[in-house]
């Protein structure tokens, strides 16, 4: 077995998949009723990630940055929610990249990489990636992941996926 093979339980395996899930979800987060879900999703992700360094960095980031900048997201249009989420995830992703000595990527690349596709295609990719992440994390339950946190994370992401599947509002 080659030392270059990335193990499913490692951040190098599930990290890129999580970013694709988040950026894809952000592309279709054009609903007024999901603004309060996003901070909870990221907090739940921080609690669930099997990498303590990643957990601590995300928790610290969330203490100092708001994902949604308004007190009542229902006062913002669906497109406004989408823009805030895309911008904040882009900033978060670049902060992680800088910490890991990976070059930043321009915000203009988000649409090229994640957008300009039918919602159904984006959702299909999200479902596939979610299966890969869940399968990678499942063996780590009890050792690196609290089962209750894992269940909460799956449930809250599933709720967001259900809402964005319905289209904009």
Regions found by a protein language model. Name each.
Residues 1-169:
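Aromatic-rich, lipid-facing transmembrane alpha helices and their immediate juxtamembrane interface loops
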């Amino acid at each position: 077995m080659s030392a270059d093979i990335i193990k499913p339980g490692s951040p190098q395996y599930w990290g890129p998949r999580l970013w694709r899930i988040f950026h894809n979800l952000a592309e279709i987060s054009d609903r007024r009723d999901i603004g309060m879900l996003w901070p909870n999703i990221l907090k739940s992700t921080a609690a669930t990630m099997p990498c303590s360094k990643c957990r601590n960095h995300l928790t610290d980031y969330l203490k100092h940055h708001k994902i949604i900048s308004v007190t009542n997201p229902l006062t913002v249009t669906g497109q406004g929610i989408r823009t805030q989420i895309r911008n904040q995830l882009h900033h978060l992703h670049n902060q992680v990249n800088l910490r890991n000595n990976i070059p930043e990527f321009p915000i203009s690349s988000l649409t090229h990489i994640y957008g300009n596709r039918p919602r159904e295609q984006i959702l299909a990719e999200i479902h596939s990636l979610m299966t890969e992440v869940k399968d990678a994390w499942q063996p780590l339950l009890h050792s690196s992941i609290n089962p209750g946190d894992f269940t909460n994370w799956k449930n809250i992401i599933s709720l967001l996926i259900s809402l964005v599947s319905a289209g904009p509002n």
